[in-house]
């Protein structure tokens, strides 16, 4: 065998979305006040294209493609290569993230400053009108 378990691909995406959020917004993924609010994963979809082997170097390219009232969609493109080798596409994934207010137990509107940071980073409008 020598390949990683399929669940590991989702872990790669998790690490990528945590890094994306902190680099784009300057905030940790738990973006609420004293833990009352945070971003939660509402949905994850993945299409596997090829195996990832234990010795491979994996890269995840992440971008935001859509922002709603309380959620946003991230797309992930996963590539892998042997050290010194050519990258190959191994998976494509989408993650739906929702801002959740634990105090009231439901989704909360995304803060405009986070929307502005994501749109600035992506260089285009992402929020639906």
Model-inferred region functions:
Residues 1-41, 101-129:
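Hot-dog-fold acyl-thioester-processing enzymes
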Residues 1-5, 18-21, 53-66:
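Charged, low-complexity, helix/coiled-coil-prone segments
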Residues 41-43, 73:
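Short coil/loop residues immediately preceding or within conserved phosphate-binding loops
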Residues 48-57, 64-129:
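HotDog/MaoC-like acyl-thioester-processing domains
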